[in-house]
């Protein structure tokens, strides 16, 4: 398993084995203007999603804690009819607080509650308090796209120099 994150705008190089997760992480990288590389060994979807969250959390942690980095950020992002807000802050008590319930939804074959598992593993590994709010949206794929785009933009704010 390998993950690398740097500021920049090269295309993301992501291979999780789960196409919809690859797509969501590509949106995160694009909206945050990060150069993102992630490769995971094959496993079941639940393990791959958690591994991806942990690996990216570990990769983002140094950027978020660098001298002069803001350490907090927030963003609203749309995806078609969906609108999501993500706010985050470096924390010694990582957690995810969300009003999004997609436990029954599927997006591209991915159980959407696996996206919640990704966010929890990511926040824990990066050491973040992460708040996710769905403002509007019906289509589960668009909701997930809006969330991951907002996460990328909020991470960009948090990792940039103050």
What are these regions (language model features)?
Residues 1-162:
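Structural preference for solvent-exposed beta-strand-turn elements
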């Amino acid at each position: 398993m390998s993950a690398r994150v740097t500021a920049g705008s090269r295309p993301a190089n992501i291979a999780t084995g789960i196409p919809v997760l690859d797509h969501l992480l590509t949106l995160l990288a694009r909206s945050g203007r990060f150069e993102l590389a992630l490769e995971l060994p094959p496993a079941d979807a639940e393990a791959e999603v958690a591994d991806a969250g942990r690996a990216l959390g570990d990769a983002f942690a140094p950027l978020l804690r660098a001298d002069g980095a803001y350490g907090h950020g927030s963003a609203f992002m749309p995806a078609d009819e969906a609108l999501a807000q993500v706010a985050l802050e470096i924390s010694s008590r990582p957690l995810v607080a969300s009003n999004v319930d997609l436990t029954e939804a599927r997006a591209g074959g991915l159980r959407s509650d696996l996206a919640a598992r990704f966010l929890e593993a990511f926040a824990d590994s990066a050491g973040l308090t992460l708040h996710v709010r769905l403002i509007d949206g019906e289509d589960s794929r668009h909701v997930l796209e809006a969330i991951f785009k907002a996460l990328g933009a909020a991470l960009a704010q948090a990792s940039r120099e103050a």
